[in-house]
Every structure is written in C-alpha cells, then in structure tokens.
C-alpha cells in the first residue's frame, strides 16, 4: 500500500552501550511512551534486519519510524511535552542520532 499525503519522520539511534540490554529496553520503553503523541498517525520501532548487502547500513541500534498528516503535525510533535520528556529521559543512552524526514514527491 502506497503512503500518500504524509510526512515521514524516520530516526536511527546508535546506543552508547550497544550490547547493554537494559539501555536498549529503556530506549524502547521511551519510544513506546513517545508513540502516544496524538499527532502521530503510525509508528514502528525496529532493529536492523538480518540482511547484508553493500548498500545496507545495519550499524544502528534502534529505528523509530513515524508518519504524520503534514509538516505542521510533525512540528507540533517536536515541541510536544511527551517528546521533550523522551529527550530528557533517553538522550543519555545514545551516542548518535540520524533523522530522515520526507514528503511526497
């Protein structure tokens, strides 16, 4: 099913302690709380798939995929107290974050 008329926000997290199950579980729990932001239409919490091709970067720890109806909803998410609390509680867990935002072509 093709997604149309959406704003995609895809975040990749690299944990400081990549082998620490407690840190991983804490990040995932934080993302589950974050999923309650009302402007989020869909979300997915993932880990690297067991695929290996030259073009794949599977070095991240956790991915966070969300969709919004529009940029205004995503902007609202950025300043939502739930999002700010997530950053406050979980930012010490990661060493690197990369965000890819996209809209319809």
Locate predicted features.
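C-terminal structural segments of small proteins and small subunits
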Residues: 71-92
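Short S/T/G/P-rich N-terminal loop/turn motif that feeds into the first structured element of a domain
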Residues: 1-61, 65, 69-76, 103-105
């Amino acid at each position: 099913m093709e997604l149309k008329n959406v704003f995609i926000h895809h975040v990749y997290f690299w944990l400081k302690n990549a082998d620490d199950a407690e840190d991983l579980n804490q990040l995932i729990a934080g993302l589950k709380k974050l999923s309650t932001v009302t402007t989020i239409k869909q979300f997915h919490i993932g880990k690297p798939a067991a695929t290996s091709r030259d073009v794949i970067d599977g070095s991240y720890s956790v991915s966070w995929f969300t969709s919004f109806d529009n940029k205004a909803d995503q902007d609202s998410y950025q300043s939502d107290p739930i999002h700010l609390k997530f950053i406050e509680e979980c930012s010490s867990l990661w060493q690197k974050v990369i965000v890819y935002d996209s809209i319809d072509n």
